[in-house]
C-alpha cells in the first residue's frame, strides 16, 4: 500500500508515466496491457486499475498509439510509443538522472554545492 500512496503525487505521476513509456518502448511493435502491467510491477507495486488510466492519459497526450491485433481468436489491444513519446521519454530519462543523483547525494550525506 505504501508505494501505491507514493505514486499518486505529481512526481509519482510523472515517474509512472516515464516507467510505462520505458516499458512500452522496449518493443518496436508495441505491447499489450497485461504485459505492461507485469513489466511495470518488476519495478514498483502497482495495480492494473492504476495503470490503465496512465495508458489512456499517455494515448491522449499522443505519447502512445493504440491498435488491435488478433490473438487466440480475439482482439488484443496493443500500445506503441510514438515519436512524441520517444522525445518525452528522453526528457524523462534526463530528469530522472538529475533527480536520482540529488537523492543519492542526500542519502550519502547531503548535497554538495
Show the residue positions of the predicted features.
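Beta-hairpin "wing" of winged helix-turn-helix
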Residues: 61-75, 80
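N-terminal helix-turn-helix DNA-binding core of bacterial DNA-binding proteins
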Residues: 8-52
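Alpha-helical DNA-recognition elements
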Residues: 53, 57
Amino acid at each position: 500500500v505504501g508505494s501505491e500512496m507514493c505514486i499518486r503525487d505529481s512526481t509519482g505521476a510523472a515517474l509512472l508515466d516515464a516507467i510505462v513509456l520505458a516499458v512500452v518502448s522496449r518493443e518496436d511493435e508495441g505491447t499489450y496491457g497485461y504485459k505492461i502491467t507485469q513489466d511495470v510491477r518488476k519495478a514498483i507495486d502497482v495495480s492494473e486499475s492504476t495503470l490503465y488510466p496512465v495508458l489512456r492519459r499517455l494515448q491522449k497526450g499522443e505519447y502512445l498509439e493504440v491498435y488491435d491485433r488478433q490473438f487466440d481468436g480475439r482482439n488484443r489491444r496493443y500500445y506503441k510509443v510514438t515519436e512524441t513519446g520517444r522525445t518525452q521519454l528522453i526528457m524523462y530519462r534526463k530528469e530522472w538522472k538529475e533527480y536520482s543523483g540529488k537523492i543519492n547525494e542526500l542519502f550519502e550525506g547531503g548535497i554538495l554545492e
